[in-house]
């Protein structure tokens, strides 16, 4: 099917991956020390532990006929640097990121935090999905729902 002169509007998704390192401790102030230890196990260590997180951010939208892009990947890289790397890389999530003062720093909540931060800097309506790899086997996908 030809797109020349047909006015066809094509939608696409574009993803970019980054990595950051951070430490945290899984602990809920709503649970006793015994309940925290039972629920979170070794991840409840009072000294915390760290991860090398991988994050895949997916945006979606119409492919611009003039540029051939949904979004310039250089721009997406800048947005991700501002919304993810600056606040999270080489940080203790529980101590250095105010959001986690009252929110348990599970990977689910890290994904929500990243989504919310990206929503502040990205053009309206383009963010589609945030995928956070805590490890190669532990992955959370969040779509703002």
UniProtKB/Swiss-Prot annotation:
Recorded GO CC terms: cytoplasm; cytosol; mitochondrion
Phosphotyrosine PTM positions: 128
GO terms for biological process, alphabetical: amino acid metabolic process; central nervous system development; tetrahydrobiopterin biosynthetic process
Effect on the protein upon substituting residue 47 to D: In HPABH4A; transient phenotype due to partial PTS deficiency; total loss of activity
Family annotation (InterPro entries): 6-PTP_synth/QueD (IPR007115), 6-PTP_synth/QueD_sf (IPR038418), PTPS_Cys_AS (IPR022470), PTPS_His_AS (IPR022469)
Top-rank taxon: Eukaryota
Keywords: Disease variant, Lyase, Metal-binding, Phenylketonuria, Phosphoprotein, Tetrahydrobiopterin biosynthesis, Zinc
Cofactor: binding comment: Binds 1 zinc ion per subunit.
Residues that coordinate or bind Zn(2+): 24, 49, 51
PTM comment, free text: Phosphorylation of Ser-19 is required for maximal enzyme activity.
Protein's pathway: Cofactor biosynthesis; tetrahydrobiopterin biosynthesis; tetrahydrobiopterin from 7,8-dihydroneopterin triphosphate: step 1/3
Impact after mutating residue 56 to M: In HPABH4A; mild form
Residues with Phosphoserine modification: 19, 28
Presence of the UniProt keyword Metal-binding in the record: yes
Cofactor: Zn(2+)
Catalytic activity entry: 7,8-dihydroneopterin 3'-triphosphate = 6-pyruvoyl-5,6,7,8-tetrahydropterin + triphosphate + H(+)
Family, similarity comment: Belongs to the PTPS family.
Subunit structure: Homohexamer formed of two homotrimers in a head to head fashion.
Pathology noted in the entry: Hyperphenylalaninemia, BH4-deficient, A: An autosomal recessive disorder characterized by hyperphenylalaninemia, depletion of the neurotransmitters dopamine and serotonin, and progressive cognitive and motor deficits. Neurological symptoms are unresponsive to the classic phenylalanine-low diet.
Functional summary from the UniProt entry: Involved in the biosynthesis of tetrahydrobiopterin, an essential cofactor of aromatic amino acid hydroxylases. Catalyzes the transformation of 7,8-dihydroneopterin triphosphate into 6-pyruvoyl tetrahydropterin.
Protein name per the record: 6-pyruvoyl tetrahydrobiopterin synthase
Organism (species): Homo sapiens (Human)
